[in-house]
Amino acid sequence: MLLNKITFFERFEHDILSGAKTITLRDEAESHVITGQILPVSTFETDRWFCDIQIIDVTPVKLTELTEMHAKQENMTLPQLRDVIAEIYPGLEQLFMIRFMILSQ
């Protein structure tokens, strides 16, 4: 079933709105989006809407395959990105990279 919205931790809101964060790495349960799909974006903590995004593409990627390019698209260093992934998805190897662009804020 396709997602009908997506949430991000509040700490990522500024990076998303500024265009510094252009991908999100998710587990399989949160990977059910399709190219061209438009989603409202809310904060995870309070479910406050802050923008709409359009999905550019979805690509499977393993944790061990993450590079500096992925980190840059997340507006982090590679060690920071790996730490965040370990915090959110402990022990998970298979991720899905969702590339997106902001439509409205």
Swiss-Prot record:
What are the disulfide bonds?
none
Active-site annotation: 21, 24, 74
- Name the UniProt key words of this record, in alphabetical order: Hydrolase
MF (Gene Ontology): hydrolase activity, acting on carbon-nitrogen (but not peptide) bonds, in linear amidines; N4-acetylcytidine amidohydrolase activity
According to its UniProt record, which reaction does this protein catalyse? Answer: N(4)-acetylcytidine + H2O = cytidine + acetate + H(+); N(4)-acetyl-2'-deoxycytidine + H2O = 2'-deoxycytidine + acetate + H(+); N(4)-acetylcytosine + H2O = cytosine + acetate + H(+)
Coiled coil regions in record: none
Report the residue ranges that make up the ASCH domain in this protein.
7-93
Physiological role: Catalyzes the hydrolysis of N(4)-acetylcytidine (ac4C).
Q: Which family does it belong to?
A: Belongs to the N(4)-acetylcytidine amidohydrolase family.
Descriptive protein name: N(4)-acetylcytidine amidohydrolase
Q: Which organism is it from?
A: Shewanella baltica (strain OS185)
